[in-house]
Amino acid sequence: MANRNNVTEFILLGLTENPKMQKIIFVVFSVIYINAMIGNVLIVVTITASPSLRSPMYFFLAYLSFIDACYSSVNTPKLITDSLYENKTILFNGCMTQVFGEHFFRGVEVILLTVMAYDHYVAICKPLHYTTVMKQHVCSLLVGVSWVGGFLHATIQILFICQLPFCGPNVIDHFMCDLYTLINLACTNTHTLGLFIAANSGFICLLNCLLLLVSCVVILYSLKTHSLEARHEALSTCVSHITVVILSFIPCIFVYMRPPATLPIDKAVAVFYTMITSMLNPLIYTLRNAQMKNAIRKLCSRKAISSVK
């Protein structure tokens, strides 16, 4: 296989080849990346430092924010630095690392969002059993399952891609390495592999998305027996979670639940689910959550007081 693989690096065309647009891309995506990192790190620090945020919901939210920070760091820094240069290349091993990182963190996030939906279901539909069911060791186990599941998903994907022969061309019409862009460059028949990718990525996204939507429907149906205040709080939680699910899953389903072909819109979709979603998630979960907003205010005021002293 090594003799058939003559490609040592790939050329990335990026979002655009227009020099003026590349300067705009540098500024815009630098702002997006910085905001995403600040927002997600702020949530992790706030939850870790706030005794009032010790429930399983915030435990999972802290991990989700950590994953979002990691996920946005897989491709965004290279996109930003590449916008400063005319020639955009990535080594073969670097390309494989990008693919692994992207699918690892995305796989962890997909499973963790499903875990969070289960947590919401138990909290709203079975409140009397919540502390019994969602014990600390159970929460830690569920997070561990998310990490293992993401690792297995990414490992399976990368093992198949690494075995493909790349004889040239080596030009990728994208700003990052992704499965479909790579298998289209392979000098062998990849039809079966394309179907496998659709099953391993697209079908998993679709299945988890349906499970999440069903859980939300069950939760909303059960709210008719709750008080008005409880309904409002539960509805706010569900709306935030449904919004994040839609932002995370719809692009995944669009990209992978189709034949292995690259479309012009794929770049815009990739920007959305690799960068924009990671920036929006902290806003979605904090703007509608009074406890999070209060905890952030207390943390900021504490830091301000300590800096004055």
From Swiss-Prot:
The keyword DNA damage is assigned to this record: no
Disulphide bridges, residue numbers: C95-C187
Topological region Extracellular: 1-23, 78-98, 157-193, 257-267
Source organism superkingdom: Eukaryota
Transmembrane annotation, as ranges: 24-47, 56-77, 99-118, 138-156, 194-217, 234-256, 268-287
GO molecular function term, any single one: olfactory receptor activity
GO CC annotation: plasma membrane
Membrane protein topology class: Multi-pass membrane protein
Residue ranges that the UniProt entry lists as topological domain Cytoplasmic: 48-55, 119-137, 218-233, 288-309
Sites carrying sugar chains: N6, N87
Keyword set, alphabetical order: Cell membrane, Disulfide bond, G-protein coupled receptor, Glycoprotein, Membrane, Olfaction, Receptor, Sensory transduction, Transducer, Transmembrane, Transmembrane helix
Localization annotation: Cell membrane
InterPro entries, per database record: GPCR_Rhodpsn (IPR000276), GPCR_Rhodpsn_7TM (IPR017452), Olfact_rcpt (IPR000725), Olfactory_Receptors (IPR050427)
Family per record: Belongs to the G-protein coupled receptor 1 family.
Function recorded in the entry: Odorant receptor.
Stated name of the protein: Olfactory receptor 4C13
Organism: Homo sapiens (Human)
